[in-house]
Amino acid sequence: MVCFSKYSGITLDMRLILIDWLIEVHYEYECIIDTLCLAIILVDEFVDRIDKIDRKYFQCIGICCMNIATKILEPEHIGSENCNFISASQYTTDVIISYEKNILQTLDFHLVRKTILDSLWSKIKDFSRQKKNMGIFFTIVSMTSDKYKCFPCEKIADGIIKLVDLIDNYPIDSIDYTDEINTDTIMRYLWSQLTICTNKKLDGYTDLIKNLEIDFEFMKKLTSDIILKPKIVLFPSKNLELYTPLRHCFQYNTEDISNITVVKNLGEGTYGTVDLVTLNASKAAIKTQKELNEEISPDMVNEIVFLRIMDHPNIIKLYGYHLGSQTKLVLEPMESSLRRFIIDDTWNNLNKTLGITNNIFSDNQKIFYIKQLLEGLKYLHENRIVHGDLTCSNILISKSKLKICDFGSSKIIHPKNKLNYKTSKCSLWYRAIELLLEQNYDEKIDVWSVACICGFILGDKLFDGDNESEIIENIFSHLGTPDPIIFESKTSINIPTKKYKFVGFEKLEEKYPDITSIIYRMLSYDSKMRISASQTLEEFNKFNSD
């Protein structure tokens, strides 16, 4: 065993039973398969990093890792109370919260991983549904032992595809397949795990086969027909593809936090508060989760996770975090949000603070800020990160610097795959049309949001409304009613029956004709035709901002 050999009390069979149970949990809570894969990885790495495990808490570790994975990838997380229920109240809610924080601190919030499934998705894009399901099946089979960590993700994905092709064309009476599997290390590993799982009575494994519409009797026949040679030895190894570079940040202790002096409140919301503080004689911004002694919220988990892997001059920096009775994020301080800078009553004072004379927000300054916003967005999308909630309140300014903040709604997007619209929490005025019409989405929702922010910066709010239906009607009244082919699936939102023609934004066109033409391309109803962040930046770089 790779991770578990140092724990005499926890066997590989115990691990298999845990994974089988997590498969059941994943179906009960209708999680995507990616969530299950991430949870398994987190279990293995946590076990690998700690010195001692009490076997009676092994299941607690499993359900906590599943809960963490849902916070990263699902529209709704399982929650500590449901974790207590799922585990038949073996562990109190307080114990579950404590273990979850221990896992997060031990892993240092390093939760964005390249998985076998990531490598597989792009390779099986054009497969039949049956072959795709078989690929997913063997991905989970590969992770029923912790030896999957001995192989690069790409290699396992390639082995899965070879095996799926082999089974798809399998003639029962042929012995050639036995030789082919035995001469390929990864296929042999996959087959050995398939044989183990098929010959044990595993409820989760049975559910997996049933839900993926795989013929169990056929698989049983295959495992009896194909005989493996004596076991190969897999030496313990850490698969470096599971790790991504992290920015350094501190884990502040209680004593550090007690030395904070609050200078002023910068804002508050449903998440909690943000304060400007001095910490160790330096200024910082501290975001504090509102609830006391509660599990860390999905937004806080996401924010720490994504800020740990990002390093760009137009992205806010995370100095560190503290997981106490309240979760605290220690962030780079900035003077103002873009929203406050543009529309609040403190306009004159802020202009003075930011070094802008005569209360004039010049056209060059507007272009300069927009370019910085696009530089940050380009960086996000190049790293497969969807921000998910870009608004004027989530853009910060200090003097000539602009930085993107608030990554609580951010997601990793896989190439050629779209995210479930239910995972989006984008603010109403900045919400892309596909989200309003309950369509799945990709990184282009951020481009739509930036178009709306550009409107604010240039002096013309693009869309408003008190609910989804009002916003949709407002969008249609400016951009025209879209072709129904673009949004043909059903939606629970009331769509305007009136047919609108394109009229655009007359005031904006009159003052900024060239920029407005770019904004229209950023607001394309069809996300495939919508201009990318990189292309938008290229267009804005043609304008002078000196």
Curated annotation (Swiss-Prot):
Listed SMART domains: CYCLIN (SM00385)
Domain Cyclin N-terminal: start-end pairs: 1-112
Domain Protein kinase: 260-544
Pfam families: Cyclin_N (PF00134), Pkinase (PF00069)
Catalysed reactions, as listed in the record: L-seryl-[protein] + ATP = O-phospho-L-seryl-[protein] + ADP + H(+); L-threonyl-[protein] + ATP = O-phospho-L-threonyl-[protein] + ADP + H(+)
Listed GO MF terms: ATP binding; protein serine kinase activity; protein serine/threonine kinase activity
InterPro entries assigned to the protein according to its UniProt record, in alphabetical order: Cyclin-like_dom, Cyclin-like_sf, Cyclin_N, Kinase-like_dom_sf, MAP_kinase, Prot_kinase_dom, Tyr_kinase_AS
Entry binding sites for ATP: L266, G267, E268, G269, T270, Y271, G272, T273, V274, K287
Superkingdom of source: Viruses
Entry's EC annotation: 2.7.11.1
Keyword Transferase: yes
Keywords associated with the record: ATP-binding, Kinase, Nucleotide-binding, Serine/threonine-protein kinase, Transferase
Catalytic center residues: D389
Top-tier EC class: transferase
Keyword flag Phosphoprotein: no
UniProt similarity note: Belongs to the protein kinase superfamily. Ser/Thr protein kinase family.
Name this polypeptide is given: Putative serine/threonine-protein kinase L268
Organism placement in taxonomy: Viruses, Varidnaviria, Bamfordvirae, Nucleocytoviricota, Megaviricetes
